[in-house]
């Protein structure tokens, strides 16, 4: 697995995955490994790849991480509004600039990795904290500059991830405080009594009901992993019923043992990234000694991932989406998924100790 990352995946995404004309990364490669050059590019993908490349031991990969982050900082803010871009045109001009919390979170996550590798991004971090402050709500943050509804669980989960990573990288307690604000939202608002995690809410954080509400088992598994990392990094108990949460994740699996995209019987699709989160959650729970009877071990999850998603003609690539019968639905591999795969593999290789 280490060799797959070092000799296949990182070379694929730092070489073929890089647009030589702009120095940015492609949004996706097709399943033959050819860049999808006509696709718009999400700014978050630039910095997610920066986060990944910063973890490499190769100096060239680390230099590319800083290059991508520098591009996002220098060219990612709209001149008139000052908002952070969401999407870029193929020529890298700004197409949309909603100043979305999800995007700000990943800018900050990339900064945490750059701090950890020794880069001087102090002034960038100060600026990004100011950009985040523009979204501050009485509890949590608004979803974007327009304060669009519904309120969303997902960007707050990534703020939890980012805040924990920034605390680990800097030791600054303000980041731990931010993580604990997100954790409070999770305990009080997002997590239901049966262990499922709700996605959408009204302005006052009242859960939406009926078809307006969605539950994604991949995000539930991601919370298991992130809460475990928070406890390890801060030394503080999260006061979350992890066994209940993880059991609800397992209950959401389909007949193959993999996670569908949504927690309902009508969902006929399953992407690759939720399986990486299932792997991370399983590794964390195994290390904690809290694996329930009948749960898969990490190697079982890895085997399913290999059979369904990772055994491809492109070394270091993956298949993105299948239906529940195993038929391939995707025609490209989004670069955004590399972040999920890299962290899952590194967590597995460490025995659940670190990434």
Language model feature labels by segment:
Residues 1-355:
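Glycan-recognition and catalytic cores of secretory/periplasmic carbohydrate-active enzymes
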